[in-house]
Structure formats: structure tokens, C-alpha cells
Amino acid sequence: MRRFLCISGAVVMFAALAIAGSKSVGAATPATFTLTAGALSISAPVASVSLGSQVASTNAGTISGSLGVVTVTDQRGGTTTWTASVISTAFTPTAGPADPASNVSYAAGPITVTTTVVATAVAATDLTGVSTVVTGASTGISAASWNPTISVFVPANFAPGVYAATITHSVA
């Protein structure tokens, strides 16, 4: 029996030394992912917006109202600049003369920015041609939003009715 205990003890001691002296073996797997540059985009309300109303008059006047939130999103990355522009068609009634786009002005108002963009509003007083309304410079992914006020000069003696125009935003 003593011999069995001695042999058993030797086996246990050998096994303990083997475990203590062994090195663990592992397998490391590198993992990566890719972020690709996105686009420069602009969004604006697509539903019709009422700028307000007033009584037709022998005196000229101005109608002003909020257009709704406009947002430029720049997902190009890096150091980039952009220019947001706007153009308007004439405000045309169902009957009678149109109120020309030269009577339409645009004020961007306060600009809310995210991350690393600096955006500056530029007053536009005549929307017959493409007019710059906000410029931006960023480092990285960014966005800028504003809620512009559209003002329309209404000449004296314009006929009562609903006047409609299309205001188009673009960014480059």
C-alpha cells in the first residue's frame, strides 16, 4: 500500500508541476471596420407653407412668415466648406399680375450648429437669381439648421387671392 501511495503522490506532483509550468496558447484576431465619406445635402420643408395674410389695399405692404427648418448636413469628413443658396419663382395668383421674385427677401435667422462647423447667415433681398443665404466651414462631420423668414413686398392695388411661389434651396 505504501508503494501505491508513493507512486500516486509522484503522479500528483508531476501533474501539478506540468500544469504550473504550461503556457496558455491563444489566437488573436485583428478586427477592423471602415467609415466611408458621405455626401453634402440640404433638406427643407416640402409641404406648402403659409406666410400669412393681409387685407388687399391701396397701400403697399409686406407679408412675412417662417418657412420652416432648413438643414445642411455635411458627411464628407475632413476640412470642407459649403454654400447654401436659394431662389424663388414669382408669387402668382389664380388671376391677375404676379408679385415678382425681386420682391421676395430671405433672412436665415439664428443658426444652430452641431460639432465642428461655423455657419454664417447672409441676407438675401432679391430672389430672382440664385442667392447665397448661409455659408459654412467645418472639420469633420457636421450639420447646421436655421428657420428662415420669407418677406414678400406686396405692391399697392394687388387683387385679393392666394399667391403661390416655389422657393428652392441648394447646397454646394
Model-derived segments and their meaning:
Residues 6, 21-172:
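Signature of Gram-negative chaperone-usher
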Residues 2-24:
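Secretory targeting and sorting signals
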